[in-house]
Amino acid sequence: MTNLTLYQFRTSPFCAKVRKILDFKGLDYRVVEVDYLDRKDLLAASGQLIVPALTLESGETIADSDRIATVLDDLYPVPTIFPLEWRGIHLALARYFDGELEDALFRAALPDEIAHYARLGRGHAAFYRLIRERKYGAGFCDVTVRAHDAAMARAHDLLAPLDATLADRAFLLGRIGYADFALYGQLGYLAIGGDLKIPAEMENLRAWYGRVDRIRATLDPET
């Protein structure tokens, strides 16, 4: 039995990526939901304030989802998330998903994420807005919420080619790998409110999301 601890925010797409990789590899792990306002346990464990952070069996705690993924595949290589012949393509796709696509989906999901932190309390909501507006500029949250339709249209345009690609395959490159987990994490933005908001007409993408979501340790050959 492994002894791993994942420090996370539930709404983080990068934490969702790491959770699904751990599930795919069949690893036992404990989840610590970090309080957005009180990160002392995360700081004590990792020496920094960013999630995801993963404490390994050795006691070392590492941060950054890309680094965590690489270390996990080195320590627990079966099943691999980096099929040898496609490793570079998986890494390139993951960087795109965690960059341009992340920006689009984050903006599309911002109303749901604001509502999530509001449910946690006024202090959490205020601090969330402060962090976002320190990064993107004053008034960012309100402006982005008002532009929600445009944000959803941009997300739709970026997701449509992926839906088309998945028409004739179970996973992005045929065999499951790191890019699938990165995309899964980002699409978690569209489930923050509870209902999955991948457009209904994107049946291939919705089916793919379901396949990845059901992964625990080994992939059901029937899926």
Where are these regions (language model features)?
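Alpha-helix C-caps/helix-loop-beta hinges
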Residues: 51, 78, 168-169, 184, ...
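GST-like fold's C-terminal all-alpha helical module
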Residues: 99-207
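GST-like domain detector, emphasizing the conserved glutathione-binding G-site
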Residues: 1-127
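Intrinsically disordered, low-complexity polar regions and short flexible loop motifs
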Residues: 206-214
